[in-house]
Amino acid sequence: MTTASAYQALDAWIDAHFDEEVRFLQALVQVPTDTPPGNNAPHAERTADLLQAFGWQAEKHAVPEAEVRDYGLTSLTNLIVRRRFAEGGRTVALNAHGDVVPPGEGWTHAPYGGEVVDGKLYGRASAVSKSDFATFSFALRALEALAAQPGAPTIQGGVELHFTYDEEFGGEMGPGWLLRQGLTKPDLLIAAGFSYEVVTAHNGCLQMEVTVHGLMAHAAIPHTGIDALQGAVVILNALYAQNALYKATTSKVPGITHPYLNVGRIEGGTNTNVVPGKVVLKLDRRMIPEEDPVTVEADIRRVIAEAAATFPGITVDVKRLLLAKSLQPLPGNVPLVEAIQKHGQTVFGQAIPNMGTPLYTDVRLYCAQGIPAVIYGAGPRTVFESNAKRADEYLVLEDLRKATKVVARTLLDLLT
C-alpha cells in the first residue's frame, strides 16, 4: 500500500462512518457540562461508555472531591485512552475539553439538543470543544482500521486521547492535574481548535477580583458614609484609561493584536436607599506573548492603588483569580505544523496558515512541561462565527468531516 492509498483509505473510512461520528457528537452535546457549577463527572462517565463501544477502556482519573470544591467546581473526572501500535515511535496526545459556559438566553435551537439543520449541528459545546472529542476519536478509529488492513504501513508508537473537564477555570484540574500526577508525558500534542488555521501561540490571561470597601449609610444622610460605588467608578475609569493605552503595544504574532482589559462583572450595594459599603469588580487582562505576567500584574495593582488613593476613605483588596501564561511555540512542533498544513491544503483546498489566537487554552500547560503542541480541530475560521459562548453555537458538519481526515492523515505521518 502506497502512502497516497493509505491517505485515501483513511478518508474512505471516515466518510463511511461519518453518520456515526455525528451521532457520537450529538450524544456528547446532549449531556450538559455547564461550568459553573462544573458538575462534569457524569459527562465523563457517558463519554467513557461511548468510547467502550469502540473497544477502548478509558482510564477514569477522578480529581479528589476536596480539591475540586476548593477550586470552585462540583465534580471532575478526566479521561485518558491509550492506544499502542507497534513498538518504537512517538506518543501523540489529542486533547479536548468537555466543560463549557452555561448556555444563557436567546437560543432558537435547544442548547442540549444536538439538532442538525442545514448541515449544522447546534448545541452548547458543539464547536468548542466537544466537536473535537469526535474529531480525535474518529481519526484514531480510522488509523486503527488502516493498521488492520493487509499491506498497510507499519504504525509505530501510540495515540492518547485526553478528554478533560477544566478549561473554563484555567485547566489546572484538567491537563494540569494529569501532568502533575505523572499520568501522561506524550512526545507531541494536538489540542482542540478550528479547521482553517493551525495555532502555535496564544495570549495569556490574568483575572483579578477587586473589592472596594467604603462605609454604608442611610441615603438621607449620605455624608455619614463613604460611597464604595463612587470609589469603584474612579478605579474603573483608571482601568479603562489604561486599556486605551494598550493599543500602542502590538504583538509580532499573526492573529494577535494588542493587550486588552475587560471588566466583566460588578456587584455591590444592599438597597436603593443605602450608600454602598462594598463593591466587587472582576477583571480580565489578556496578555500578548511578548508580555511578562509578573510585570502585567504589578502594573494593574499600581493603577488600582493610585486611583483608590484619590478617593478618600475607601480601602481596596485585590486578589488574583487566575494567571494563565501565554503559549510560546516550541521548536519541536515543526512536524505537527507541517503535517497539518500539508493535509489541510489537500482536504480543504486552501492554505492553512500558522497563526496565533487571542484566546488562552490548556495547551500552555503541556508546553510548560516541554511537550511541543499545536491547536487544530473542527470548526470555522473564527470563534465569533461559531457562536461559541453565545446563543445558537453550531458546527458545520463538513468542517468536522474534513478536520477528522486532516488529523487522521497527520497521525499517520507522525507514526510511520
Locations of regions flagged by a protein language model:
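Hydrophobic/aromatic beta-strand patches that form the interior of the parallel beta-sheet core
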Residues: 59, 92-94, 162, 188-190, ...
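Metal-dependent amide/peptide-bond hydrolase catalytic core
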Residues: 1-9, 33, 70, 194, ...
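Solvent-exposed alpha-helices and their adjacent loops that cap or buttress functional pockets
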Residues: 85-87, 114-115, 152-155, 180-184, ...
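Glycine/charged-rich beta-loop-alpha catalytic/anionic-binding loops adjacent to active sites
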Residues: 111-125, 213-214, 388-389
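Acidic/His- and Gly-rich active-site-bordering loop/insert found
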Residues: 2-121, 145-155
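Acidic/histidine-rich catalytic neighborhood of metal-dependent amide-processing enzymes
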Residues: 121, 129-205, 415-416
